[in-house]
Amino acid sequence: MEDFVRQCFNPMIVELAEKAMKEYGEDPKIETNKFAAICTHLEVCFMYSDFHFIDERGESIIVESGDPNALLKHRFEIIEGRDRTMAWTVVNSICNTTRVEKPKFLPDLYDYKENRFIEIGVTRREVHIYYLEKANKIKSEKTHIHIFSFTGEEMATKADYTLDEESRARIKTRLFTIRQEMASRGLWDSFRQSERGEETIEERFEITGTMRRLADQSLPPNFSSLENFRAYVDGFEPNGCIEGKLSQMSKEVNARIEPFLKTTPRPLRLPDGPPCSQRSKFLLMDALKLSIEDPSHEGEGIPLYDAIKCMKTFFGWKEPNIVKPHEKGINPNYLLAWKQVLAELQYIENEEKIPKTKNMKKTSQLKWALGENMAPEKVDFEDCKNISDLKQYDSDEPEQRSLASWIQSEFNKACELTDSSWIELDEIGEDVAPIEHIASMRRNYFTAEVSHCRATEYIMKGVYINTALLNASCAAMDDFQLIPMISKCRTKEGRRKTNLYGFVIKGRSHLRNDTDVVNFVSMEFSLTDPRLEPYKWEKYCVLEIGDMLLRTAIGQVSRPMFLYVRTNGTSKIKMKWGMEMRRCLLQSLQQIESMIEAQSSVKEKDMTKEFFENKSETWPIGESPKGVEEGSIGKVCRTLLAKSVFNSLYASPQLEGFSAESRKLLLIVQALRDNLEPGTFDLGGLYEAIEECLINDPWVLLNASWFNSFLTHALK
């Protein structure tokens, strides 16, 4: 059959048919009958249009040997055979210029004389059956249908055959010839039987018995029966005036569509109040590491051994004292907790064999810090359901907080490069499918750009601490286990390095459900003086615990070393996601890939190498009050990664809501920029939904302020 098609039809028609099949993922070599049917249909469409023109008086004429001087316009616009995007562009342009109703499905032709779209059908079955299927599918009075068969029959809407007898006879003769040629090669029977009907779902299958009763029970309000509802749905035209559609849906809905212009949107209102505070599970830019290079000590890789080794690299310990108390906490308990950690580590060192894990003594300060015995007693509902004034606790509204500059600094810092590499090349996972080497090449380029990024350090730190906490929570439920906060990296010279950020002490952890909370106390080293931005550290008690000698350009200087202590909590599900923070690498790699794909499709070749190696080109990174910020491709990779990492570190219901709701406004603004003339109703309600999420979360507030910068520049 394939050979027959290639011999029987014009090469241009064959090429168009192949293209159409590929667009739908079909193979002309396998689905040969379909290949023949598409070629036949294309040829009929072209023959329908051939030789038909409109002269300068607007009359329809047939010209077979063209007079080059005649001012003639083609009578038919051919839509069939174009790729979908182009075809719809042609249809839209016809509808805009002629005011003809836009069809739901792509028609085959447009007749400029009769001002109507035409659907051409070629069938191997009865013409009237095929006609009904087409009419049922299109469901439009406006599109004219004309069906031809291989036996010389035809059928058209209202018996209006559009063309003269001779033109139609030419088409019928050609179809008859194709049929005979196929028959002589023994191909006709298979071709005739392979025709499937128009793929519409049979609409009227009967529902009986239980399903019928359930259907009647589950109707929307105001409908008495399933028939009543079906009739309403069948009569519902999806196109047309939106206001009418809404009022048709419900009498209560009354929406006026307002045009959305450059002057329409206002900036988001950010909350007032004291500045927002740090709420991440561990310190980010303020963290300080005690490190050992090329670790080779006994028990290397066992966290407690590594931690003790790191602690020994520091000699400036001093008697700790509180420099910034926690407003609501019993601060001496935090001080005692740190002293206890030091004492117990000292005790371990004096033992002959260091244990692999360390459970802290359950002292009063740790019981207080970990909320031991603080949970309200659970009472069986049966025992208290008769109490008349049983009620849920009143909970206060969260206090509103304003945006503080520290969160932007945190983000900027996360985008920076460090002098160590935090991931090996294979951290993103090996190729599974043989997707050539393009995927590996992209991954390697991307990894090179982000392996030294501070956001990548946060990923590895997050993965480590969450894994260790979840393990301890399951393995030592009743114990106050001491968990060192550790990360590993490689220096510029490729030497291995183990870092200690501080310690976590885990509380009781009988975690049955995903959301059950385990309390922990974190104690983290830092050189940041908390008195510079006290509001950032509202949830912390900060101790001064030592003096550190730092090498600077002017020689060695001594700086106080602080310990940031706070009570915190997490759950199984949060730890599970924390353990999977490496996904952030994948998410940002995919965003970069879509940028490369866009470039590649324009240039029609893979642009991976050029994309990463053209150092002169800059790319948009984000919006700031100064305008659109641009940077190198490496900076783009690191910024996208930092955004993904912060979405994980600062995950919250406020962020979920803000992302979902602000996206709607973003799409409307994008539509305006693309000159699509968007209309909206209840824009105030959308603003309300967005601003409801702006309460006190630093990352959400920063995103909202970026959104405002975007609005300002997008609408200039």
From Swiss-Prot:
What's the PTM story here? Phosphorylated on serines and threonines by host kinases, including human casein kinase II.
Could you list this entry's UniProt keywords, alphabetically sorted: Cap snatching, Endonuclease, Eukaryotic host gene expression shutoff by virus, Eukaryotic host transcription shutoff by virus, Host cytoplasm, Host gene expression shutoff by virus, Host nucleus, Host-virus interaction, Hydrolase, Inhibition of host RNA polymerase II by virus, Manganese, Metal-binding, Nuclease, Phosphoprotein
Which cofactor is essential here? Answer: Mn(2+)
* Protein location: Host cytoplasm; Host nucleus
| Record-listed E.C. numbers | 3.1.-.-
Q: In this record, what's one Pfam family?
A: Flu_PA
Q: Which residues are Mn(2+) 1-binding?
A: 41, 108, 119-120
Position of sequence motif Nuclear localization signal 1 (NLS1):
124-139
GO MF terms listed in the record are: endonuclease activity; metal ion binding; RNA binding
**Which GO terms fall under biological process for this protein?**
cap snatching; DNA-templated transcription; symbiont-mediated suppression of host gene expression; symbiont-mediated suppression of host mRNA transcription via inhibition of RNA polymerase II activity; viral RNA genome replication; viral translational frameshifting
An example Gene Ontology CC term for this record: host cell cytoplasm
Q: How is the cofactor bound?
A: Binds 2 manganese ions per subunit.
Q: Which positions, given as ranges, span the membrane?
A: none
Q: Which family does it belong to?
A: Belongs to the influenza viruses PA family.
- What subunit structure does UniProt give? Influenza RNA polymerase is composed of three subunits: PB1, PB2 and PA. Interacts (via C-terminus) with PB1 (via N-terminus).
What name has this protein been given in UniProt?
Answer: Polymerase acidic protein
Source organism of this protein record: Influenza A virus (strain A/Duck/Germany/1949 H10N7)
What high-level taxonomic lineage is stated for the organism?
A: Viruses, Riboviria, Orthornavirae, Negarnaviricota, Polyploviricotina
